[in-house]
């Protein structure tokens, strides 16, 4: 899975990322192996932390940049 490669490219341990996500290292390791589905809240947190698009994290695109945030118009 791509999340392992990104973590390793950033010289981070599974324990460090698990702490960022508020989960155990064991559970995070299961996400990396694909044994458990990565919850959406963790996907969003990883995208914010790494400043990458969720689609890139999921392997749906090779575009790393997050989508531009949309401005909410106020009346």
Where are these regions (language model features)?
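Acidic active-site catalytic centers that drive phospho-/nucleotidyl reactions
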Residues: 7, 32, 55
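Short alpha-helical DNA-recognition segment
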Residues: 11-33, 45
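A short, Lys/Arg-rich alpha-helix, primarily the initiator
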Residues: 1-9
